């Protein structure tokens, strides 16, 4: 999955599965669909964030709408025109039916934002 980050308050193009690019003047969005997930299982997917700016960017932290979903962010800065892998993990314990969560990634460039949308269908 490739995610591109941008630097502004404007939304980028429609979110695409596992892809995003950081560029000046937009919010990079990515959509992660886990599909059917067995109840009480943890599942993981990865996506790539590409730095389309002219300065290195560090992915500092993230916020999530649910403690059942978390990210593993790279520790090193992403150089211009380079990319880094981010891992998203979803724990289906305590969830059922259709699940959707939103995560936002804070970067070292305050005008560069990444929005991650996650969905899953919990089956028993």
Regions found by a protein language model. Name each.
Residues 32, 45, 82-88:
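Short strand-edge motifs at loop-to-beta-strand transitions and within beta-strands
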Residues 54-82:
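Surface-exposed binding patches on compact interaction domains or structured appendages
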Residues 39-46, 93-102:
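Short, solvent-exposed loop/turn segments enriched in Ser/Thr/Gly
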Residues 45-51, 88, 101-106, 118:
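Buried hydrophobic-core signal for structured, non-transmembrane domains
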Residues 10-52, 122-124:
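Beta-sheet-dominated interaction scaffolds and their linkers
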Residues 1-6:
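Bacterial N-terminal signal peptides
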Residues 96-124:
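Terminal connector regions
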Residues 52-55, 94, 109:
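Short, acidic/polar linear motifs in exposed loop/turn regions
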